[in-house]
Regions:
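Flexible, acidic/Gly-rich N-terminal and inter-domain linker regions that tether
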Residues: 1-100
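Conserved aromatic-histidine-acidic binding/catalytic patches
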Residues: 4, 33, 37, 41, ...
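N-terminal pre-triad scaffold of radical SAM enzymes
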Residues: 45, 90-123
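Short glycine-rich or small-residue beta-strand-to-loop segments that form or flank ligand, phosphate
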Residues: 107-108, 162-165
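Short connector loops/turns at beta-strand edges and beta->alpha or beta->beta junctions
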Residues: 114, 123-126, 258, 297
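Iron-sulfur (Fe-S) cluster-binding segments and ferredoxin-like electron-carrier domains
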Residues: 120-132
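Short cysteine/histidine-rich metal-coordination sites, predominantly Zn2+-binding motifs
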Residues: 133-141
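Conserved AdoMet/S-adenosylmethionine-binding subsite of the radical SAM
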Residues: 142-156, 160, 169-314
């Protein structure tokens, strides 16, 4: 049940250390503590996610690498790094709406996620303040959303809107309906993409939060009735994230006719070999998820140990 996962979420370093104290050696525990003291993202991991980590070798585990920093692995940040490395705020005509490309916009509707990734490019806004970063606020706000709707409607070239954050998984069902319906009714909007890491880290929500999934299905059906595409974009980075629960959750999207595409980030030690990426793509294909993007890791504070070279991506 997703409510149990949410209730038992680990959102403090001391809670995490207590949860893993019998799973890992003392040296690893102290290394984690040092890691979070230097991290721009707060700790937020689910029991389900912790269960997928290989605790016989947590240092090299591809899921541990993504969510739990180790102080011993930190490398100096790139000299050109900025907290908002993609300059999303600079290209935002209204708060939380980035309009960089002529026909596409990124709509950051919320500033929380089911878990927090170490390599998040939005550490300037997502989650709570840390020792390293004081966040700006992009909390769910209907008045802020209305300003975004007005801007999108005023720009006829805008056809493709990505609803992200934060994470669309954390939207209430009525917010999913409101956001989806409002965007679909704007004449120039032809495509909507809900973006979420949730399916990879908490598939229980799709299986047990029926109101939320019904809202997503209703928005998709409304879009189809008006000749507009509503798709769901998820974020699996390693084959170990694809489980039986993932398959069951993705079957709900498949049965509802909702297209699901995957966006991966190329991460050192996680998926930066042809073999690991090929296996990920194959397993996603088995659960009806279309490979879509593979991003090269951006300049992110405290995550230089995960960034590959551009040549690695080319190869």
């Amino acid at each position: 049940d997703y409510r149990w996962q949410s209730k038992k979420i680990i959102n403090r370093v001391d809670k995490l250390l207590d949860a893993i104290k019998d799973l890992a050696p003392d040296g690893f525990i102290s290394d984690v503590e040092r890691g979070f003291s230097r991290a721009p993202m707060a700790v937020r991991v689910s029991p389900y996610l912790l269960s997928l980590i290989d605790w016989t070798n947590p240092v090299d585990d591809p899921l541990r690498i993504q969510f739990i920093p180790l102080g011993s692995k930190f490398l100096p940040d790139h000299p050109k790094l900025g907290l908002d490395s993609l300059h999303e705020q600079a290209d935002a005509p209204v708060p939380g709406l980035t309009h960089r490309y002529p026909d596409k916009a990124l709509f950051l509707v919320i500033d929380t996620c089911p878990v927090y990734c170490r390599f998040c490019t939005r550490s300037y806004a997502v989650g709570v303040d840390t020792d390293q970063v004081e966040k700006i606020s992009l909390k769910a706000s209907k008045s802020r959303w209305e300003r975004a709707f007005e801007y999108i409607a005023s720009r006829p070239e805008l056809e493709d809107i990505v609803i992200s954050g934060g994470d669309a998984y954390n939207l209430r069902a009525d917010w999913v309906r409101e956001l989806g319906t409002s965007l679909i009714k704007i004449p120039n909007v032809q495509r909507i993409r809900f973006a979420s890491k949730g399916l990879a880290v908490m598939p229980q929500k799709v299986l047990t939060d029926h109101d939320w999934f019904d809202a997503m299905a209703e928005v998709h059906a409304l879009g189809r009735s008006m000749g507009k595409e509503v798709a769901f974009h998820t974020h699996f980075n390693h084959a170990n994230e694809v489980t039986e629960l993932s398959r069951q959750a993705l079957n709900r999207f498949f049965d509802a006719g909702i297209i699901v595409r995957n966006q991966s980030v190329l991460l050192r030690g996680v998926n930066d070999t042809p073999e690991s990426m090929s296996l990920l793509v194959k397993r996603l294909g088995h659960i009806n998820v279309h490979p879509y993007y593979v991003y090269v890791h951006d300049l992110v504070q405290g995550a230089e140990d995960m960034r590959t070279t551009v040549q690695t991506a080319v190869d």
